[in-house]
Amino acid sequence: ENGLYNPGRGFRLETAVDVLHEKDTPTKELLELSEKYVADSVSLAQSYFYLTYLIGEKLSEENFQTMQAYFDELQKQGKKAVLRFAYERDFMGRAAAGPTGEQILEHLEQLKPFLEKNKDLILVVQAGMIGAWGEWHSSIQGLENSEETKATVLEKLLSVVPEERNVQVRLPEFKNLLKDKPELYKRLSFHDDFIVIRPDRWDADMHEGTAKFDQIVAESPYL
């Protein structure tokens, strides 16, 4: 509890908030996990905001109050968010619904003032929105199959995230969608939940010795 503490680096929790249905308890998981791991001096929270039941709807003032309550608690605890917005909580076609590209763009535009307001509590924003858990695969609408859609969503995300903050993508090919736009490309960094020590069917060809792995190794020190 009294160890080294830096809200921009360190251990992290993982929390998820259903923005519509958890409006009365948006900080519940954050509070529980913070208490559970208090001895570890956790300084970051992987923060998922699920807009699952808001597809096709404008985000309301109540929705923003729900998300703000979460960020207010982060500030109280001295933590920062590794932030991701998503809609679909299952994969392989099992999600009940998913947004169109246009619906994603509309929500992103609404989120711009919220992100600006809370930028000091955000370490980085992950390029969620598309597919299962915002991982850019398995979307109901098949959005991951369109290079144009992915590039458009990514470019829009970069336009609404404050310039002081980077955006993380899971795979180098997503970053490479904007290779011809250096001012945007340089703000893209990487995250991957499945980098492993040996080749695996789920590693998306991200193991040592592949071009993707080499790109991450080469570019990550500068991001």
PLM feature segments, named:
Residues E1, E32-S34, L111, E155, ...:
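Intrinsically disordered, low-complexity boundary segments flanking structured domains
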Residues V124-G131, E135, S139-L223:
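Catalytic-core regions of glycoside hydrolase
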Residues N63-K80, A97-V124, S146-V160:
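An active-site-proximal structural segment forming one wall of the substrate-binding cleft
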Residues L30-E88, T100-I104, V161, R165:
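Aromatic-lined substrate-binding rim segments of carbohydrate-active enzymes
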Residues E1-S43, Y48:
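Boundary/entry segment of secreted carbohydrate-active catalytic domains
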Residues R9-T15, S43-S47, A81-F85, L123, ...:
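Hydrophobic faces of well-ordered beta-strands that scaffold small-molecule active sites
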Residues V82-M92, L111-E144:
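Active-site groove signature of glycoside hydrolases
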